[in-house]
């Protein structure tokens, strides 16, 4: 076959045993043979085996032939013709100079509208951007890599670099400098203009294009200097750092005298003395078993004395109630009248048949609120279990709730609780007659709401 007689040394054998050359297209004769076999109805896989050409090469050649009708290599997928012709580049430059903000796709549409290019020769958007970047804007950004341009200048002309031009001074700058500089804030006067700081660009300093600049560069080059501050300038700057932002137990030696005088010691002592004077000591004894402070409204006279009565049980009683003041079972509070003996002013005590009673007068501040002492932990108020409910409790359950010394198996029937009336529980009669609690007049019923009216329908 013709492709086997090709010069050896630059190719090899493919997977089918056919010879090929790297980087070279398939010979024209083989291409024509592939097309002829395809017209005869031979499948591409059979063509590949007969001609020993890879299946990909056969498919590519046949596909290109069906699309374009050509079997020549490089027609599809090859190098495109050059679209960046001098005429197109010149037009793109004209459009960009007329409208510098013109986009590449606008330039492409204008090239097609004016007939400069057709659909096959018009450059792409990326090509137009590359042309603008490399060929249109290049004359405006010529780098100054050499100083050859000085030879074309006449002796009377001087090319001054842009960095040598002094920028206009700010209207806020004065003899003290800019108001935003450190010297301007601190009020430090700057030296004369002959001693001002000069910053020269190292790249353009090597290319001095004038005789005056070359003569000035012969002198020693000035370096950047740092501003030095005196002691009178450093002290105001260090004051904010010496101030203590957090309270400390011990005074720091770095505090200034002005800061030490902010809170003098006599002022603190006088404040402590005033605070101590407002605290009044209380000698009121506290009752036992008062674990929590319970507060109720005041219903009694705040200055009426109270008596603590200890009752001695009868000898015939089967209860094992202790008869000491520390007992919490039979310790009661009774209001004692202001005149006469205590026994005559308390009628409920006459119902008792005890041999002796012990009374103690207490007029402390802790008993001012009357009902403040009444609570579940008040001595003299044991846990009361109603008679109707005693049947549902076992003896062991009741014994677990009440201490053995304060529990009796019999039904609890204490005479004072039966004889105490509502007048004792509410000494202030205004509470009983208050229309808030007991109103003799019938209150008008509220008008039925929408939901209630709907229920009655």
Swiss-Prot record:
Region (Disordered): 159-226
UniProt xrefs under PROSITE patterns: PAIRED_1, PAIRED_2
The name this protein goes by in its record: Paired box protein Pax-8
Xref: CDD domains: PAX
Chain residue ranges for the region called PAI subdomain: 12-68
Location in the cell: Nucleus
Pfam families per the UniProt record, alphabetical: PAX, Pax2_C
Functional note: Thought to encode a transcription factor. It may have a role in kidney cell differentiation. May play a regulatory role in mammalian development.
Record field: compositional bias (Polar residues): 159-182
Organism of origin: Rattus norvegicus (Rat)
Phosphoserine PTM sites in chain numbering: 304
Region called RED subdomain, residue ranges: 87-135
GO molecular function: DNA binding; DNA-binding transcription activator activity, RNA polymerase II-specific; DNA-binding transcription factor activity; DNA-binding transcription factor activity, RNA polymerase II-specific; RNA polymerase II cis-regulatory region sequence-specific DNA binding; sequence-specific DNA binding; sequence-specific double-stranded DNA binding; transcription cis-regulatory region binding
Subunit structure comment from the entry: Interacts with WWTR1.
Residues within the DNA-binding region(s): 9-135
GO CC aspect terms: nucleoplasm; nucleus
Superkingdom in the source lineage: Eukaryota
Gene3D superfamilies to which the protein is assigned, alphabetical: Winged helix-like DNA-binding domain superfamily/Winged helix DNA-binding domain
Keywords: Developmental protein, Differentiation, DNA-binding, Nucleus, Paired box, Phosphoprotein, Transcription, Transcription regulation
One GO term of the biological process aspect: regulation of apoptotic process
